[in-house]
Design a protein with these regions (language model features):
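Pyridoxal 5′-phosphate
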Residues: 13, 18-423
Length: 423
């Protein structure tokens, strides 16, 4: 990490910090946006606020007893096991899985992807991915390429982040065992046609894995309809739960081909030195994150009561309003799709006449607007979009945002591009 004290063209004494992914400008001036309150436009990183009841459920559990399941022979442990099972069943229903036993809990989707890829792929295997993938996919694949001799190809991806089923099919060869794609881009919000891609995989007898980090809780996902064999999810984004809890769902056919890579106590078959083969114990060794699971349960209850379709429509309305406002501002480029067709509530902007890090800094310092700037842990996506290595300023919205906040965001973007002192 390098530090370089500078004086910005905006006149602020600040420190530029380079982290290897993004330059960050830390200013010393008071934030003008604070008077009207901060505006959180970084829900693609983690949702805020969390669903009602999440914090309370977790706090009550910790205060009253987070008893380990499959260990204690007493009422509190049995009650906790029932609540964990309820959460599995809610997730199985959400993703249209055949059984709640297919739901595996992990610390998050990156953990899930690593467990799966390292337990499934063998020397000589070939994988097809899209050109929009996150490093949670690409880094494990690259490591396996170097250490296990697997190979992967990137399906043709448009400058708007679009990937067709035909493009995926063209990359499938005789050694292809897996197609792995994200459902929605964390950079520009483009939604991939997973049902069409799943049909291609079924036709070629290839396993199909989907990263739902940016779509779960916003878009309807049907594992069976889309022929999904592995579905990775995180609890803290669209599902509106706490950080540190996520997981995956796995089909029986794929499960038979995956070795568990984390072994240990499960509370079952304790007389054996070998890992249990049945689900979910096969992949759930050690003490589980029970506060995280209970927080996720509260979040899923909110989603069920509110309705994912309702949440999606509210997000789409806010995003469409923002897109309409920023598209016509001189000195700003909307990256990716220019309309709401096949996209989520994520908008990436490029400021050609200034450093994007400075733009994000000014949005927060001057107008109290929190965004994310840089490469978003997805350099492959930025290469596809033509924004590498500069990156973008990403705005990602929640149904908890308001029309007034969107208007303030548009006005802030307009002002920083109009003020020549910033350039």
């Amino acid at each position: 990490m390098a530090f370089s004290p500078v004086k910005s063209r905006a006149g602020a004494n600040c420190q530029i910090i380079f982290t290897g992914d993004v330059f960050r400008c830390i200013g010393t001036r008071p934030r003008k946006g604070g008077a009207m309150g901060k505006i959180y436009f970084d829900n693609g990183s983690t949702s805020f606020p969390k669903a009602p009841g999440v914090g309370r459920a977790m706090a009550e559990l910790l205060e009253r007893g987070a008893f380990n399941i499959n260990r204690g022979g007493y009422e509190g442990a049995y009650e906790m096991a029932g609540r964990v099972l309820d959460t599995r069943e809610m997730l199985a229903k959400l993703f249209h899985a055949e059984s709640s036993r297919q739901v595996i809990f992990t610390p998050g989707i990156t953990w899930s992807l690593n467990m799966f890829l390292n337990g499934f792929l063998r020397e000589g295997d070939h994988v097809v991915v899209s050109g929009m993938e996150h490093n949670g996919v690409m880094r494990p694949l690259e490591q396996l390429r170097k250490t296990k001799g697997i190979s992967y190809d990137v399906a043709r991806t448009s400058s708007e982040g679009e990937v067709t089923a035909e493009a995926v099919e063209k990359k499938i060869g005789p050694k292809t065992r897996l197609v792995l794609v994200l459902h929605a881009s964390n950079v520009c919000g483009t939604v991939l046609p997973i049902e069409e891609i799943g049909e291609v995989c079924k036709r070629h007898d290839v396993f199909f894995a989907v990263d739902t980090a940016q779509s779960a809780g916003t878009l309807s996902i049907d594992m069976q309809k889309a022929n999904i064999d592995f579905l990775g999810f995180t609890g803290h984004k669209g599902l509106k739960g706490p950080q540190g809890i996520g997981g995956f769902l796995i089909s029986p056919e794929l499960d038979a081909c995956v070795r568990p890579v984390i072994l240990g106590g499960t509370g079952s078959h304790s007389d054996l030195l070998s890992q249990p083969e049945e689900l979910p114990d096969k992949y759930e060794s050690g003490t589980m994150n029970l506060p995280g699971i209970i927080g996720l349960h509260a979040a899923l209850s909110y989603l069920e009561e509110t309705g994912i379709d309702v949440i999606r429509r509210e997000k789409e309305q806010l995003t469409a309003r923002f897109l309409d406002g920023v598209r016509e501002i001189p000195g700003v480029r909307v990256i990716g799709k220019q309309t709401m067709e096949h996209r989520t509530a994520v908008v990436s902007l490029d400021f050609p006449e200034m450093d994007n890090a400075i733009a994000a800094f000014l949005l927060e310092q001057e107008y109290g607007i929190m965004t994310r700037v840089g490469l978003h842990c997805a350099p492959l996506a930025h290469q596809s979009l033509g924004t590498f290595p500069k990156g973008t300023v990403r705005f990602s919205f929640s149904e908890q945002n308001t029309e007034e906040e969107i208007v303030r965001g548009i006005e802030a973007v307009k002002r920083i591009t109009e003020n020549r002192n910033y350039l």
